[in-house]
């Protein structure tokens, strides 16, 4: 049986994650995805999650926490896996991890084009 697996991003996932972001139209000319990933890895890499299905990355979430509020960026689910509960499963995991670090509120950033 095929199973979705949520795990922490590692640099070996970089190419697949950027490909996912491109599929989901999350990359804009003013945002270099490699620089965004590098910045995230310098701060709190345990709050950068991916979803794998048959060893292929089909979801991602880059999460920030400043001690007061959580922020969610690059929330993506491969279009072929949308409407299957993957986004909801990922959001539950995000909420769980932020609650564990004492976060009382989450801000989600969504572009009009998304």
PLM regions and their residue ranges:
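A short beta-loop-alpha structural element at the N-terminal edge
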Residues: 3-16
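Conserved GNAT-fold acetyl-CoA-binding loop/helix
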Residues: 14, 18-41
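A short helix-loop-beta-strand connector motif used in the catalytic cores of GNAT acetyltransferases and
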Residues: 39-50, 71
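Conserved beta-strand in the GNAT
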Residues: 50, 56-64, 71-76
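A conserved beta-turn-beta hairpin within the catalytic core of GNAT-like acetyltransferases
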Residues: 64-73, 82, 101-104
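Conserved acetyl-CoA-binding loop-helix of GNAT-fold acetyltransferases
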Residues: 74, 83-96
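A short, internal acetyl-CoA/4′-phosphopantetheine-binding micro-motif in the GNAT/acyltransferase core
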Residues: 75-82, 111
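Conserved GNAT acetyl-CoA-binding A-motif
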Residues: 91, 98-110
